[in-house]
Swiss-Prot record:
Catalytic activity: (1S,2R)-1-C-(indol-3-yl)glycerol 3-phosphate + L-serine = D-glyceraldehyde 3-phosphate + L-tryptophan + H2O
Protein name stated in the entry: Tryptophan synthase beta chain
Lineage: superkingdom: Bacteria
The gene coding this protein: trpB
InterPro entries found in the cross-reference section: Trp_synth_b_CS, Trp_synth_beta, Trp_synth_beta/beta-like, TrpB-like_PALP, TrpB-like_PALP_sf
General function of this protein: The beta subunit is responsible for the synthesis of L-tryptophan from indole and L-serine.
Originating species: Pseudomonas entomophila (strain L48)
Enzyme Commission number, as recorded: 4.2.1.20
An MF annotation (GO) of this entry: tryptophan synthase activity
A Gene Ontology term for the protein's cellular component: cytoplasm
Gene3D superfamilies: 3.40.50.1100
Length: 405
C-alpha cells in the first residue's frame, strides 16, 4: 500500500474499489453529474471555503472540545479515553457539519427548495435549521415508525418551519424515507436540492458528506497534538450510514500506527434477524444509488434493520466503509442494544454527559477494549450526538426491565 492510497478515493466514477458509483434513474443522471461539477468548483473557490469556515465557527460553534474522560478512564483502568464532543454543536449532533456545507452548495447552484430524509430526526432537525437560516422551504421525509419514537425531534422540525411527510411504506424507517425523498427529487429536479444526511447515495454524495464531516478528524489531530504531543493510538465511532465515523477516520487513514474501529448496531445480536450490522451480517448489493454492503435475504430483497437507536437502523453502509472493510484498514465490530444501554448509563453517571444511543455503541466498544490496553494508549471516541432525543426510548426500556424483574 502506498502512503496515500486509503485517502485517495473515490475515482472519477465515484468508486472506492468496487463500491460506490452512480446507480440512478436516467432523469437524475444529469443532475448528479451537475452536482459533482459544482462541488468540485466550490471546493476550489476561496469564497465558498471562507463562507463555510464562518458558519462552522459562528453558527455551529466549532471547534468543539476534545475532552479527557477522566472518570471513565479510571473506571476502565486502562487506555486514556478522550471524547470528541460533536454533541456540543448547534442542534446537538455532527449532522449540522454536513448540512451547512450542502446548503451553501444549494444556494450557489440557485436551488429554491430543500428535501431530506431522516431516521433519528437529527439530520431532519439540522436540515430544517439551515433551511430556516437561509430562508428556503424544506420537506423532510421520515418513516412513520421513526416519527412515533422521535416525537421531540418532529416538533423541533415543525418549529423550524419544515414540512414533515410520514412514510408508511415498508417498515416506515430510514430506508423507506430515503426511497420517498429520491422519488421527490426525480419529480422536482429543476428547483430542488436533495440534502443527503450520510456518506451514502450516488456519487458525489459519499465523498462530499465525508469532506464536510472531515473537520471532526482534522480538529482531533490538532487538539490531541496540543494535549499529548502525538497521534491517537485508536479511534472509535458508531456506524449507521457512517458519516460521523468517516468524519473522524478520514484524516487518519494513512497513519498506519492509528488503529481504527467502526461500531455497527448489533441489535439483539448479529446471529439473529434483529440487527443493523451490514458489514458483519450483510452482502454487497445496490441500494439508494450506490454499491455497498446491505442486509439482504436469499432473493436479494433488502431486509429490515433493527437497532434501539433510530439513527443506526439503516440496512446499508456508506461505500467508503465497505471499501475500508474489504482492504482491512478499519476493523468493524458490532455492539448489541443492551451493551449500548449499559454504556449510555455508565457515561451519564461517570462523566455527567448524556450521550445519544448511537454514540453509546462506540462508548460500549471503548469500555470493552480500554481495560486491556496500557495506560499510555490514547483512545478517541466520537461522541456524535446528545441523548435528549432518546429519553423516551430509554424510559420505555427501563420500564420493561422493571416489569420483567
Amino acid at each position: 500500500m502506498t502512503q496515500t492510497q486509503y485517502r485517495a478515493g473515490p475515482d472519477a466514477n465515484g468508486l472506492f474499489g468496487s463500491f460506490g458509483g452512480r446507480y440512478v434513474a436516467e432523469t437524475l443522471m444529469p443532475l448528479v453529474l451537475d452536482l459533482a461539477r459544482e462541488y468540485e468548483a466550490a471546493k476550489a473557490d476561496p469564497k465558498f471555503l471562507e463562507e463555510l469556515a464562518y458558519f462552522q465557527r459562528d453558527y455551529i460553534g466549532r471547534p468543539n472540545p476534545l475532552y479527557f474522560a477522566e472518570r471513565l478512564t479510571e473506571h476502565c483502568g486502562g487506555a486514556k479515553i478522550f471524547f470528541k464532543r460533536e454533541e456540543l454543536n448547534h442542534t446537538g449532533a455532527h449532522k449540522v457539519n454536513n448540512c451547512i456545507g450542502q446548503v451553501l452548495l444549494a444556494k450557489r447552484m440557485g436551488k429554491k427548495r430543500l428535501i431530506a430524509e431522516t431516521g433519528a430526526g437529527m439530520h431532519g432537525v439540522a436540515t430544517a435549521t439551515v433551511a430556516a437560516r437561509f430562508g428556503l422551504p424544506c420537506v423532510i421525509y421520515m418513516g412513520a415508525t421513526d416519527i412515533e419514537r422521535q416525537q421531540a425531534n418532529v416538533f423541533r422540525m415543525k418549529l423550524l418551519g419544515a414540512e414533515i411527510v410520514p412514510v408508511t411504506a415498508g417498515t416506515g424507517t430510514l430506508k423507506d424515507a430515503m426511497n420517498e425523498a429520491l422519488r421527490d427529487w426525480v419529480t422536482n429536479v429543476e428547483d430542488t436540492f436533495y440534502l443527503i444526511g450520510t456518506v451514502a447515495g450516488p456519487h458525489p454524495y459519499p465523498a462530499m458528506v465525508r469532506d464536510f464531516q472531515s473537520i471532526i478528524g482534522k480538529e482531533t489531530r490538532a487538539q490531541l497534538q496540543e494535549k499529548e504531543g502525538r497521534l491517537p493510538d485508536s479511534l472509535i465511532a458508531c456506524v449507521g450510514g457512517g458519516s460521523n465515523a468517516m468524519g473522524l477516520f478520514h484524516d487518519f487513514l494513512d497513519d498506519a500506527s492509528v488503529q481504527i474501529i467502526g461500531v455497527e448496531a448489533g441489535g439483539h445480536g448479529v446471529h439473529t434477524d434483529k440487527h443493523a450490522a451490514s458489514l458483519n451480517g450483510g452482502v454487497p448489493g445496490v441500494l439508494h444509488g450506490n454499491r455497498t454492503y446491505l442486509l439482504q435475504d436469499d432473493d436479494g430483497q433488502i431486509t429490515d434493520a433493527h437497532s434501539i437507536s433510530a439513527g443506526l437502523d439503516y440496512p446499508g453502509i456508506g461505500p467508503e466503509h465497505a471499501y475500508l472493510h474489504e482492504v482491512k484498514r478499519v476493523e468493524y465490530v458490532s455492539i448489541t442494544d443492551d451493551e449500548a444501554l449499559d454504556a449510555f448509563h455508565a457515561t451519564c453517571r461517570l462523566e455527567g454527559i448524556i450521550p445519544a444511543l448511537e454514540s453509546s455503541h462506540a462508548l460500549a466498544e471503548a469500555i470493552k477494549r480500554a481495560p486491556k490496553l496500557p495506560k499510555d494508549h490514547l483512545m478517541v471516541i466520537c461522541l456524535s450526538g446528545r441523548g435528549d432525543k432518546d429519553m423516551q426510548t430509554v424510559m420505555n426500556h427501563m420500564a420493561a426491565q422493571e416489569k420483567q424483574a
